Amino acid sequence: MARLKPLSGFPEFLPSGQMVENHVTRILEETFELHGFAPIHTRAVEPMEQLTRKGEIDKEVYVVDRLHADPHDSRSEKDRLGLHFDLTVPFARYVLENAGHLHFPFRRHQIQKVWRGERPQEGRYREFTQAGDDIVGDHPLAEHHDIEAPLM
């Protein structure tokens, strides 16, 4: 049987490496939550129209499509989906969609996979875990020190 080569830019850990990643993730989650940041998880796909709004990153977006999609389907750009390349666009959408259910200032942390269609190299991957915390509210400067507290 031919030996399979790993897919470049998409790391997979052996169990010991996955245990290390899980441990680091737990420490981050506990630290964020200790400082009052609520955990959220957003979907992996977003409308291409939203992902490419700024324009400069559109070459890095992985488009999601069905294998047996109708070739005559004339879906518009707004109907196409892509994997998110960072957590900013999904978080902004999440806040807008759930604004009536969130308490502001809303303090969130998020740790999940993101995908970028860039050339993999040392320390740069096509799939990786991103972590972040944010505070959304009327007075962003008032909570500025809170956003940095988990980093200390």
Question: PLM ranges: what are they?
Answer:
Residues 1-152:
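TRNA-recognition modules of translation machinery and tRNA-sensing kinases, especially anticodon-binding
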